[in-house]
Amino acid sequence: MKTLGRQMLCYLLLCFAVTTYAEETISIDTDNTSLIYKVDKDKKLRQVYFGSFLDAKEAEATQVTKADAYPTFGTSYVNEAALRAVHGDGNTSTELYFEGVEQNKLSDDITQTIITLKDGCFPFTVKLCFKSYAQNDVIEQWSEISHTEKKPVTLYNYASSHLFFNEPSYYLTQFCGEWAMEMNMVETQLSRGVKNLESKLGVRSNQHSHPCFYLSLDGKAQEKAGRVVGGTLAWPGSYRLSFEVDHRENLHIISGINPYASQYILNPKEVFRTPALLYSYSSKGTGDISRRFHRWAKKYGIYRGDKTRTTLLNNWEATYFDFNEEVLSGIIKDAADMGFELFLLDDGWFANKYPRDNDKAGLGDWNYNKKKLPHGLGYLVNESKKKGIKFGIWLEPEMVNPKSELYEKHPDWVIGQPNRPLDLSR
């Protein structure tokens, strides 16, 4: 009887241990926000909660869901995948299982969490990495992908993050525009299907749209009330923010580098790190989200963000290409009298053989124009010093006009496709 009792006790302890492991809870917290993951009985990592702060007891009480933390291609998952890879042997499927988690406090404000996931068949690893900024209520998330397969792995999709929501409605605010009409705010109610905010323009990724959004979970977004998620991708190149409402009215947000024409050959032992998505949740409307990002940017995102910025006067709208030393000296004097701290000389100051009198010539010839500035740039620098303000100058070194001395001497320096006419757009 004692033996049977011991066996029963061991069995119960084993069941308890398995249950505890299966429901391991990982909380990523700020002062007012919690993002919670759990490991289910199959060792799959699930997102179970993202919202207002939950203490440890409340976090443990959350229920396991079917929401994949980082969904992959080639499994039973049929929505947009965060990861799609072709392994060294040609296998197109990846299935990730929970391996472990590390949490370290980097400072009073920052906690770093690294969750390791591994494929069940290949030596292929994905690390979901987070920095939670407690006082600013911002979470920074990125992914690190590596492997030790015998041959390279080709990555086709490699998202920075995947966020899951189950709400009655979703209102998305995006920011888009064009030259001279930037950052227009447009709100749309999401319906079943996929809405992509994206750019394929490479280094000009912000020209028509911007990698940031608001998501309202309580009807149309409000400035001072309502549950709102705000996010921005810290990446200057081609990007995609994908918002997919599935057949159960769940919303999946996948953020990262645009996979369009962006496959990456990942060699063994190499680590591919994605850009980070910065995001925040608030129950107090878009204004609260905006101020959180302002505070975060001033402290962590901008060089000398805690310092007062220099006030400057730029001559572009006042003169365009039509100016000379006398005109610019007058603007410098007026700028100083009005309390500006810096004068910035804009386009039109350079090129002689093909003067920069319009946007059709001169780019690439970075010598001052002797007709407009007979005494050189040093004269304007000294004029600024006399008035007690700094001097700055505009350059566009990555561009060239065909009508320029630089292009005449080095046409081979221009980026283009062989046997194709040049694309002369800016």
Where are each of the predicted segments found?
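Terminal connector regions
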Residues: 279-310, 317
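Bacterial Sec-dependent N-terminal signal peptides
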Residues: 1-23
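Short acidic, Pro/Gly- and aromatic-enriched capping/linker segments at domain boundaries
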Residues: 21-26, 250-267
